[in-house]
A protein has these predicted regions:
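PRPP-dependent phosphoribosyltransferase catalytic core
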Residues: 3-9, 125-189
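Conserved acidic residues
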Residues: 60, 106, 136
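Short, glycine/charge-rich flexible loops or terminal/linker lids adjacent to PRPP-binding catalytic cores
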Residues: 67, 72-109, 117-122
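Alpha-helix C-terminal capping segments
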Residues: 52-58, 76, 145-150
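Short, well-ordered alpha-helices that flank and scaffold nucleotide-derived cofactor binding pockets
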Residues: 50, 54, 74, 78, ...
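Short glycine-rich phosphate-binding loop at a beta-alpha junction
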Residues: 59-66
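Active-site-facing substrate-recognition patch
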Residues: 1-58, 185-189
Length: 189
């Protein structure tokens, strides 16, 4: 799947929103990737999952952070014949709940939807490693990172959108209302 195809799907399904957004990282942006608009379409998710699955060999488990990446992670697990787990926030940290456990040495792929700072992906990566499992990679649909990401990853498409620290956000300075569409609540500044 070529980057242009992914960008076309983002545009076609109304997944690129313009405005003033609070990202899950706590930063602000004038553009938000509303991946849920893509995930309404199983054929789109399956296409992404098939491509991501082709990048990795012998995956035994797929782990995604809840909530947004769950549909994609599940589809990648199906494509790799692996089991699927997800990590949830508890007291601010991503943890396994609901009896989810990884086995020592289990070849585990971390699947994210959008990577901005890589914080959630890094948390899941650390969780996988702490369990004794082998983290074989991190994959995402969209890479919108603007700086170094602590864990190596691959994405279907790389996009560049403006990202601002809350204290230096020109949209805040103009009084543009801030929207918080993401799945993780971060207090606004």
């Amino acid at each position: 799947m070529k980057e242009a195809e992914v960008l076309d799907l983002l545009a076609e399904h109304g997944a690129l929103l313009k405005g003033h957004f609070l990202l899950s990282s706590g930063k602000h942006s004038d553009t938000y990737v509303e991946k849920a608009r893509l995930f309404e379409h199983p054929d789109v998710v399956l296409g992404f999952a098939t491509e991501i699955a082709s990048w990795y060999d012998a995956v035994q488990a797929v782990v995604s952070p809840a909530v947004g990446a769950i549909p994609l992670g599940f589809a990648v697990a199906e494509q790799t014949s692996a089991r699927f787990l997800y990590a949830e926030r508890e007291s601010g940290n991503l943890v396994f709940r609901r009896g989810f456990r990884l086995s020592p040495g289990e070849r585990t792929l971390i699947v994210e939807d959008v990577i901005t700072t890589g914080g959630s992906a890094a948390e899941v990566y650390d969780l996988v490693r702490a369990s004794g499992a082998e983290a074989v990679g991190v994959a995402a649909v969209v890479d919108r990172s603007t700086g170094p990401v602590r864990v190596p990853f691959r994405a279907l498409v790389r996009v560049e959108f403006a990202v601002y620290d809350p204290g230096h956000c020109p949209l805040c300075a103009k009084g543009v209302p801030l929207e918080a569409p993401g799945s993780r609540h971060v207090s606004s500044h």
